[in-house]
Amino acid sequence: RSYRLPYQEAVLLLLGRKNGKSYEQAKPAKEAPKPFALPEPYGTMRRMYAYLMRQRHIDREVISYFVHEKLLYEDKHHNCVFVGVDGSGEAKHAHIRSTNSEGRVFRMNIESSASEHCFHKNGTDKSLYVFEAPIDLLSHITLNPYGWQEHSYVACCGTSIQPVLERLRQNPKLD
């Protein structure tokens, strides 16, 4: 004990604090959110096609449809990029999935992606099919090809309900 003070007061004295006042905690610096940007595409899509067709057994026509609609491509790191667009067709979300079939699998949503605009396809009928991952969506279409272009699909790219609510908001006639 220092200066015949109780233990707690002695510690406060050694720490340079008076009357038991503590220092205010520093406030964390707020980082400005980064603007959304799609990953840089690679020149060809051979690895993406090979992975989706050979490893995941997705039909070539289904892949080609989403590539043609600019909703699917291969990035410079040879990942599959699943693009989500808003009502005007502008890219607002991107989900990346590695084409690595051995070892660690890499999946992530691009920073600053708008979760309500995940990978989706709008149809003309009242059916909405909901999936956790984009590859699940493509697999379902491959396994159930009859009339698939008439249905609406959404992949939540995780467990958020926001993409489903946005599809229902955009098209109230969906079941």
Model features per residue range: what roles?
Residues 54, 58, 80-82:
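Internal active-site segments that recognize and position negatively charged phosphoryl groups
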Residues 1-53:
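Non-catalytic accessory segments of DNA primases and related replication-initiation nucleases
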Residues 47, 56, 97-99:
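Short, cationic motifs built from Arg/Lys/His that form the positively charged side of catalytic pockets
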Residues 5, 57-58, 128:
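Helix N-cap/coil-helix junction residues
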Residues 75-170:
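Phosphate-handling DNA/RNA-contact segment within nucleic-acid enzymes
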Residues 1-8, 163-175:
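Modules that initiate DNA replication and primer synthesis
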Residues 58-75:
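Short, basic/aromatic recognition patches
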